[in-house]
């Protein structure tokens, strides 16, 4: 704590797995060598009517694996795998408290990140440069102890620059692929709370993707406590996701198989869930 309102923390992590093993004696390392640096700095300002939370982070990692050595053919080239990763990110949240008793506030959130990966699987290569920017504006208030409303706007932008050589031939020319998507959206969420016994939350949001067009996402959550030791939950909702086949599965380049990537549509799914939890105090 610097003073009553301002506090900060610095987090650092270092990892070095410098030893390799081949316990099953198959000529390949059982796990890669990893050297990683991780740094984060967070700040918090908590005032009477204004709260700020922000931070920055950086990560750098080297990961190497592959064959341990030659097996009877010293002239053959060893199969090596190497991944060099760098990631930088920053985020902030500004909260303006209008009425503390009613829980009325407006919050502005923003974040940005850059992620770079240089990967090699033998002579196959995969280099990616990803940039993301996200911002949202949220309003929340309690009409009464039983009724709460949250509504907001959001904007998400993704850029994915990829360069890939999908054949194990160092003379082959890499292929460059760029993907961009901007998604503005709006949402509203209503929560009903009855003496902490029954909680019902219904939400809906609408987004417009520059790639896939407009889509609507509803959801519903129910929580019921008939007794102090039994909790019942039900949930249902719809979800959408933009697939990035190579970014999510680039490890398959280590295989000798031929990879074929079709034009992928936006993923769409309904999700349902139910649970019952029993809490029995022993003492």
Regions found by a protein language model. Give the residues of each.
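Outer-membrane beta-barrel signature, preferentially recognizing the C-terminal barrel domain
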Residues: 77-91, 177-181, 221, 225, ...
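Transmembrane beta-strands of outer-membrane beta-barrel pores
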Residues: 14-18, 45-49, 58-62, 98, ...
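Flexible loop and strand-edge segments within Gram-negative outer membrane beta-barrel domains
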Residues: 17-40, 46-106, 112-130
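Residue-level signature of outer-membrane beta-barrel architecture
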Residues: 2, 43-50, 96-98, 139-143, ...
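Surface-exposed extracellular loop regions of Gram-negative outer-membrane beta-barrel proteins
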Residues: 5-24, 36, 103-122, 149-156, ...
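Hydrophobic, lipid-facing positions within transmembrane beta-strands of outer-membrane proteins
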Residues: 1, 35-41, 56, 86-92, ...
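Repeated loop/turn-to-beta-strand initiation elements of outer-membrane beta-barrel proteins
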Residues: 5-8, 49-52, 99-106, 145-149, ...
């Amino acid at each position: 704590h610097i003073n009553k309102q301002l506090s900060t923390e610095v987090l650092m992590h270092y990892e070095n797995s410098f030893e390799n093993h081949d316990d099953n004696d198959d000529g390949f390392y059982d796990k890669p060598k990893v050297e990683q640096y991780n740094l984060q700095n967070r700040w918090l300002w908590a005032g009477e009517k204004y709260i700020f939370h922000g931070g920055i982070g950086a990560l750098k990692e080297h990961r190497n694996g592959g064959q341990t050595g030659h097996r009877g053919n010293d002239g053959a080239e060893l199969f090596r795998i190497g991944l060099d990763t760098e990631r930088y990110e920053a985020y902030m949240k500004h909260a303006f408290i209008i009425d503390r008793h009613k829980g009325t506030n407006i919050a502005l959130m923003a974040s940005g990140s850059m992620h770079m990966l240089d990967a090699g699987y033998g002579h196959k290569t995969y280099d990616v440069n990803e940039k993301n920017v996200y911002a949202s504006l949220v309003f929340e208030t309690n009409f009464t102890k039983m009724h709460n409303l949250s509504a907001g706007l959001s904007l998400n932008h993704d850029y994915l620059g990829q360069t890939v050589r999908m054949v194990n031939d160092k003379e082959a020319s890499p292929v460059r692929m760029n993907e961009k998507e901007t998604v503005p959206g709006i949402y509203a969420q209503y929560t009903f709370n009855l003496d902490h016994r029954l909680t019902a939350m219904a939400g809906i949001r609408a987004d417009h993707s520059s790639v896939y067009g407009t889509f609507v996402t509803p959801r519903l959550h129910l929580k019921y406590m008939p007794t102090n030791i039994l909790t019942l939950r039900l949930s249902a909702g719809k979800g959408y996701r933009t697939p990035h086949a190579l970014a999510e599965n680039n490890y398959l380049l280590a295989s000798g198989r031929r990879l074929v990537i079709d034009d992928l549509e936006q993923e769409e799914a309904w999700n349902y869930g139910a649970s019952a939890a029993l809490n029995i105090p022993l003492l």
